[in-house]
């Protein structure tokens, strides 16, 4: 299960530069997020290692930071693109739709380095690219609050009042998902009404 808060927290986690490798994100997700085009490589492959790195420095400095499998965000600087390939980057993202030379494409193929072209600038790509991580990575699987189809409303009302979730998953006897239960709809339900009758009175007998 995932909440809006979980998604917002994920987008704010700017310090996790290896999010794509940890979540085994497919390159197709990256292409969708940054409106990119795969120039070299297979878009169906998954990212399994490396971090996201902006290649704004000169090659002499950049080579101290690029590691095996990294995704390097660059502009039109040939020397930075070449540095990424030589340092075994897993993918080079060329921003602002800058042209990519045949030499760079050839070297990338020979070194198993993917190349993606995107019309967005480096800042925009850096902000968008983390949103390509699959939802499954953020899903919560433990300590979930669930209800059974056989639960009585009176028994779960206190839980609904304490926990500030909007919806709760409902499971069958086998633990399989059946649907969602709205907290608001249940809290607004009428309480049980009891009518006392005197069966000794003919008019009240059932």
Each language-model region and where it sits:
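Gly/Thr-rich phosphate-binding loop signature of adenosyl cofactor/nucleotide-binding cores
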Residues: 10, 17-80
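Feature captures the catalytic cores and cofactor-binding loops of soluble hydro-lyases/lyases
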Residues: 54-139
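Tandem CBS (Bateman) regulatory domains
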Residues: 3-28, 48, 119-146, 157, ...
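Short, acidic, Ser/Thr-enriched surface-loop or helix-capping motifs
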Residues: 172
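Short, small/polar residue-rich loop motifs at catalytic or cofactor-binding pockets
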Residues: 162-165
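Extracytoplasmic Gram-positive cell-surface binding/anchoring modules and repeats
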Residues: 148-151
């Amino acid at each position: 299960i995932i909440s809006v808060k979980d998604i917002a927290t994920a987008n704010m986690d700017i310090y996790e530069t290896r999010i794509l490798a940890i979540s085994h994100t497919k390159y197709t997700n990256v292409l969708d997020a940054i409106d990119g085009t795969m120039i070299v490589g297979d878009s169906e492959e998954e990212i399994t290692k490396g971090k996201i790195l902006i290649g704004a420095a000169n090659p002499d400095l950049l080579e101290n930071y690029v590691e095996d499998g990294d995704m390097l965000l660059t502009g039109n600087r040939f020397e930075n693109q070449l540095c990424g390939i030589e340092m075994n980057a897993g993918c080079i993202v060329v921003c602002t739709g800058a042209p990519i030379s045949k030499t760079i494409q050839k070297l990338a193929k020979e070194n198993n380095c993917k190349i993606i072209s995107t019309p967005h600038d480096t800042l925009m790509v850096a902000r968008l690219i983390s949103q390509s991580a699959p939802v499954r990575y953020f899903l919560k699987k433990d300590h979930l609050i669930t209800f059974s189809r056989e639960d009585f409303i009176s028994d779960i009302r206190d839980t609904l009042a304490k926990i500030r979730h909007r919806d709760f998953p409902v499971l069958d006897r086998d633990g399989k998902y059946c649907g969602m239960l709205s907290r608001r709809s249940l809290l607004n339900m009428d309480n049980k009404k009891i009518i006392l009758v005197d069966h000794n009175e003919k008019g009240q007998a059932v």
